[in-house]
């Protein structure tokens, strides 16, 4: 909010745009901005497309197809072409980008590659049961369906903005979590900033974790060499801070730089659990915290997404 407050001294809020990658992040930023004394009397509705996702902003600037390709559209396509049924998905799975055909198209587009080009370098197992041949066969009816039904996908929102939209008349553009932006998104952002006096990327090159979808770690590390660094952390205590530094050290060494990460005043503790199947002192501590504190716990995983292993653990422990 500090940078936004500085911008408000020079520009109207109507001419300042903040974009992020998720609705949750955009909503959180909007809520914080609206708490500023300078924003008294400004409504959420007035800020709908002043602080939003990149896709929402691109879509708002377009005339024409507005409806997003939905699960109902997918079911319609599945009746037209049986290849779409090679992988059956529920509506929630479809909305979570679990269908591998649509995932492949999004990843190829995000990396700025054709379907054939992406196949040469991608993890082919990640898109099973589809092959390049089946994906190419499905692409034509998919594109025709979107055209005939006047619907668009998220890639269309970005590309249509790049190809057709007029550069917005704004004074400042701020991009949150900029390191997650893929190839076409960066092109769209540059177009948005054409008339802007100030253009900011906010993010952390060390957190570029979406390279599979087109984000470019090398690009953001080059960009961040002369960036303003935020040194004081507000989340992690000293123990976790030191652990994170050890984990990220190879990245710093690879790019040849050092960063200052100051922890909070909390010391904190680090526990190692070899597995959730065997008792150990760390397991005893974990169970005690789960059962007797109001702390929040996040269980993460590697590989195929599944919550079955942690549900089994909870049942075994009577949680």
Report each predicted region and the residues it spans.
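Accessory N-terminal region flanking or inserted into the helicase ATPase core
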Residues: 15, 90-174, 183-188, 201, ...
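Conserved helicase motor core of SF1/SF2 NTP-dependent helicases
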Residues: 23, 168, 172, 179-266, ...
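Short acidic-hydrophobic, aromatic-tinged amphipathic segments that line or gate anion-handling sites
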Residues: 268-282
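Conserved helicase core region in the C-terminal RecA-like lobe
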Residues: 51-58, 174-177, 202
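P-loop NTPase Walker
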Residues: 1-67
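Short, polar/flexible loop-turn hinges at active-site or ligand-entry regions and domain interfaces
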Residues: 13-15, 38-47, 64-78, 87-94, ...
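Conserved beta-strand elements of the Class I
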Residues: 17, 298-300
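Short, aromatic/basic amphipathic alpha-helical patches
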Residues: 29-43, 216-223, 309-318
């Amino acid at each position: 909010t500090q940078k936004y407050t500085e911008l408000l001294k020079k520009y109207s809020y109507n001419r300042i745009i903040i974009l992020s990658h998720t609705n949750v992040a955009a909503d959180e930023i909007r809520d914080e901005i609206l708490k500023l004394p300078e924003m008294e009397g400004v409504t959420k509705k007035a800020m709908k497309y002043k602080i939003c996702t990149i896709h929402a902003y691109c879509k708002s600037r377009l005339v024409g197809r507005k409806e997003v390709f939905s699960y109902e559209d997918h079911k319609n396509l599945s009746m037209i072409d049986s290849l779409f049924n090679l992988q059956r998905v529920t509506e929630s799975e479809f909305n979570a980008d679990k269908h591998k055909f649509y995932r492949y198209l999004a990843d190829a587009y995000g990396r700025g590659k054709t379907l054939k080009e992406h196949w040469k370098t991608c993890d082919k197992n990640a898109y099973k049961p589809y092959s390049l041949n089946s994906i190419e066969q499905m692409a034509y009816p998919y594109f025709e369906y979107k055209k005939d039904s006047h619907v668009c996908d998220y890639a269309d929102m970005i590309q249509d903005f790049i190809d057709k939209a007029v550069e917005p008349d704004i004074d400042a553009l701020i991009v949150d979590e900029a390191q997650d932006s893929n190839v076409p998104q960066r092109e769209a952002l540059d177009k948005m900033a054409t008339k802007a006096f100030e253009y900011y990327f906010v993010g952390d090159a060390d957190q570029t974790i979406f390279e599979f979808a087109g984000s470019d770690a090398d690009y953001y590390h080059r960009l961040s060499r002369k960036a303003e660094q935020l040194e004081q952390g507000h989340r992690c205590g000293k123990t976790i801070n030191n652990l994170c530094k050890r984990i990220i050290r190879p990245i710093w060494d690879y790019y040849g730089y050092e960063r200052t990460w100051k922890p909070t005043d909390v010391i904190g503790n680090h526990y190692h659990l070899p597995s959730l199947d065997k008792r150990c002192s760390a397991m005893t501590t974990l169970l005690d915290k789960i059962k007797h504190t109001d702390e929040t716990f996040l269980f993460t995983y590697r590989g195929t997404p599944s919550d079955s292993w942690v549900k089994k653990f909870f049942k075994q422990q009577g949680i």
